[in-house]
């Protein structure tokens, strides 16, 4: 018999019982903390979410980090005025108190070639991160096959450059191989104030599978949003349920420590 993770309300109860003094809270952003928007620039971070993250950062002794496909500089803009520890760019960047590491950029010519897929009226949106390039087709789903062919041709035109394609929710991202969120989290957990704590991660997409995979070896717990992954402690229905769970955890621990 397959044991399924505990769903929404019960998962929220489990989450609320976590001991903030002993965990490292690791949070995906798009589709987890905030709702996915038609384009990456259209997302919104509400003040109550900022407040919950600020309180939880204090309660965990600073062991709260964002784990995102976005570059860290974009995360800083989204969550301003806070500059939280982060694994950015699907593991291409890591910051604890400063940017510790960053992957080598993809060649400009390759990025330019890939970006040519965003023809006028196609609905395809280019997100050039330097070390990777993401092509969002949420507004032009009919172009997915053409987009995959374009990416394959672009990679073939640069045989000396090792790349791989990371699929996500209506997005295809060309990046360096062996760069992923899981390895980024593993490295993050080596640094204070994360070292020695139990990592608790919430994610929603196939791009988060590498984190779920490393959690058992780190003694951690994983929660997902809207879909089932193996080995999880629970599943939240939607980002609003995640935000409510964070608010509940922040409030309960805040009350106990006051």
Where does each model-flagged region fall?
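Substrate-recognition/cap helix-loop segment adjacent to the acidic, metal-dependent catalytic center
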Residues: 70-89, 143-163
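Charged, glycine-interspersed solvent-exposed loop segments at helix/strand-loop junctions
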Residues: 124-142, 163-175
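Short amphipathic alpha-helices and their capping/turn segments at secondary-structure boundaries
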Residues: 5-21, 74-78
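Active-site phosphate-binding/coordination module
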Residues: 44-131
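Mg2+-dependent phosphoryl-transfer enzymes with acidic/Ser/Thr/Gly-rich catalytic loops
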Residues: 2-8, 20, 46, 182-258
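Asp-based phosphoryl-transfer active-site loop
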Residues: 18-38, 66, 185
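A structural signal for isolated positions on well-ordered beta-strands in alpha/beta enzyme cores
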Residues: 24, 63-65, 164, 200, ...
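Substrate-recognition "cap/lid" segment bordering the active-site pocket of phosphatases
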Residues: 87-113, 166-196
């Amino acid at each position: 018999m397959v044991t399924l993770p505990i769903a929404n309300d019960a998962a929220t109860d489990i989450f609320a019982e976590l001991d903030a003094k002993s965990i490292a809270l690791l949070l995906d952003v798009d589709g987890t903390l905030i709702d996915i928007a038609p384009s990456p620039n259209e997302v919104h971070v509400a003040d109550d979410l900022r407040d919950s993250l600020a309180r939880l950062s204090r309660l965990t002794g600073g062991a709260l980090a964002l784990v995102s496909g976005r570059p860290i500089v974009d995360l800083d803009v989204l969550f301003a005025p806070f500059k939280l520890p982060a694994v950015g760019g699907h593991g291409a960047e890591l910051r604890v108190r400063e940017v510790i590491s960053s992957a080598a950029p993809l060649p400009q010519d390759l990025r330019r070639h890939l970006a040519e897929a965003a023809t006028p009226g196609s609905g395809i949106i280019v997100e050039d991160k330097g070390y990777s390039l993401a092509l969002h087709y949420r507004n032009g789903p009919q172009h997915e096959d053409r987009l995959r062919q374009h990416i394959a041709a672009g990679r073939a035109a640069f045989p000396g450059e090792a790349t791989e394609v990371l699929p996500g929710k209506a997005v295809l991202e060309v990046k360096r191989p062996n760069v992923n969120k899981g390895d980024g989290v593993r490295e993050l957990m080596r640094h204070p104030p994360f070292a020695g704590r139990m990592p608790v991660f919430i994610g929603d997409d196939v791009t988060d599978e590498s984190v779920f995979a490393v959690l058992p070896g780190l003694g951690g717990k994983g929660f997902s949003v809207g879909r089932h992954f193996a080995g999880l402690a629970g599943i939240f229905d939607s980002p609003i349920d995640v935000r409510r769970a964070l608010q509940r955890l922040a409030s309960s621990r805040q009350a106990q420590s006051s």
